[in-house]
Amino acid sequence: MQALTNPFPIGSSSLIHCMTNEISCEMLANGILALGCKPVMADDPREVLDFTKQSQALFINLGHLSAEKEKAIRMAASYANQSSLPMVVDAVGVTTSSIRKSLVKDLLDYRPTVLKGNMSEIRSLVGLKHHGVGVDASAKDQETEDLLQVLKDWCQTYPGMSFLVTGPKDLIVSENQVAVLENGCTELDWITGTGDLVGALTAVFLSQGKTGFEASCLAVSYLNIAAEKIVVQGMGLEEFRYQVLNQLSLLRRDENWLDTIKGEVYE
């Protein structure tokens, strides 16, 4: 894809602050390490700013939200906004939780670099009809035409922010560009935390100076292409999970991996 340039080798071992849930915490930490950066996970309000101030990117994931974690999230997001620290917000569960949806809308005032979610979550957030249950997307919510138009309008309201919408076809929308990407495999939906991992990888690429649009395209494509290489081998679910990290660490050695991205970028 001509609009993207290879981010590897990683130029500096950036510190990525992930405020995420306990379920996917280990996967995110190892995924960040596999790309050559360093993870830290701190969500106690008493120390959250100490770690955020040392970081080169911030990833906020709303899984397992609590009152204390919400306080820490708001503190970190405020600092990121004031210091121009790249920030990714993953709108997990906004289809079900009014508390999470309200928090995400408040976080928009802190101007995240990337707002991420699955098709159902983003449709819910922008006020479109959706069928999402829990934290999962519905197959009924994969229509992108109406969503694309609304996201273009939101990008004008929140200039500088990109939307990363995951699904069978991944949609990335910024003020001036739209990407529709088609790599991936259904096996990624069978293990928990892969969606969260996309957000963490987006933060990694943001820490290397990529724009929100570029970082989103790179992150979702990198994970999807790594997974495609595993599926070719054929294996059980636990082995597939194990091999995800292997391929994340190996794919960056392939100087031509960008050539395997399937999709289009529109100006």
UniProtKB/Swiss-Prot annotation:
Cite the EC number. Answer: 2.7.1.50
> Which enzyme type, at the first EC level?
transferase
Please provide the Gene Ontology terms (biological process) for this protein.
thiamine biosynthetic process; thiamine diphosphate biosynthetic process
- Binding positions for substrate per the UniProt entry: 41, 193
The record lists the catalysed reaction(s) as: 5-(2-hydroxyethyl)-4-methylthiazole + ATP = 4-methyl-5-(2-phosphooxyethyl)-thiazole + ADP + H(+)
Q: What is an example of a Pfam family matching this protein?
A: HK
As cofactor, the record names: Mg(2+)
The protein's UniProt keywords, in alphabetical order, are: ATP-binding, Kinase, Magnesium, Metal-binding, Nucleotide-binding, Thiamine biosynthesis, Transferase
Residues bound to ATP: 116, 166
From the UniProt record, which GO molecular function terms apply? ATP binding; hydroxyethylthiazole kinase activity; magnesium ion binding
Q: In which pathway does it act?
A: Cofactor biosynthesis; thiamine diphosphate biosynthesis; 4-methyl-5-(2-phosphoethyl)-thiazole from 5-(2-hydroxyethyl)-4-methylthiazole: step 1/1
Q: What does this protein do?
A: Catalyzes the phosphorylation of the hydroxyl group of 4-methyl-5-beta-hydroxyethylthiazole (THZ).
**Which family is it part of?**
Belongs to the Thz kinase family.
Q: Can you name this protein? A: Hydroxyethylthiazole kinase 2
